[in-house]
Amino acid sequence: MKTLQIMLLTGLAAFALACGYGSHSTTPPTPGTVPNVTALVPNNANAGSTKVVLTVNGTSFNSTATINWKGASITTTYVSGNQLMATIPDADLATSGTAAVTVTNPGTGMGLYGGGTSAETSNSMTFTIN
C-alpha cells in the first residue's frame, strides 16, 4: 500500500512539473506612453521667491503622472491629459540656478506572469531661478 502511495505522489509531481506548475515564465513589461512636455508656466522665478504654483503643459499625461523637479518626484495634481500642476516650495527657490523639469507616467503593475507597462519619462524643460 505504501509503495502505491509513493508511486501516485511521484506520478502526480511529475505531471505537475510537466504541465508547468513547478515554475512560470514571465512576460516583460511593454513600453508605456511617453509624455511630452511643451511648456512650463511660469518658466522662471526670482531667487528668494515664496512658493510658486507650476503648471506643466504637454501631451500624453496619464492620471497618475508625476512632475519631477531636479530628478525628484514632487506632489502633483492631475488636471488633464495635457496639464499637471505642482507647488514648488520656498526652499527650492532660495538660490539662483536652474531646475530640470520632467514628467513621468508610472508603469502599470505586473501580474503573476509579468506583463504590465514600464514607466516612461518625458523630455526635459528648464525652469530658471534668477
Give the ranges of each region predicted by the language model.
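Short beta-strand segments within Ig-like beta-sandwich modules, predominantly Fibronectin type-III
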Residues: T75-V79
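Short glycine/proline/serine/threonine-rich loop/turn segments at secondary-structure transition edges
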Residues: D92-A99
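Hydrophobic loop/turn residues within beta-sheet-rich immunoglobulin-like superfamily modules
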Residues: T59, P89-A91
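Beta-strand-rich extracellular modules
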Residues: T104-T108
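Short strand-edge motifs at loop-to-beta-strand transitions and within beta-strands
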Residues: N82-A86
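Beta-strand/beta-sandwich contexts
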Residues: C19-W69, T98, G109-N130
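Sec-dependent bacterial lipoprotein signal peptides
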Residues: M1-A18
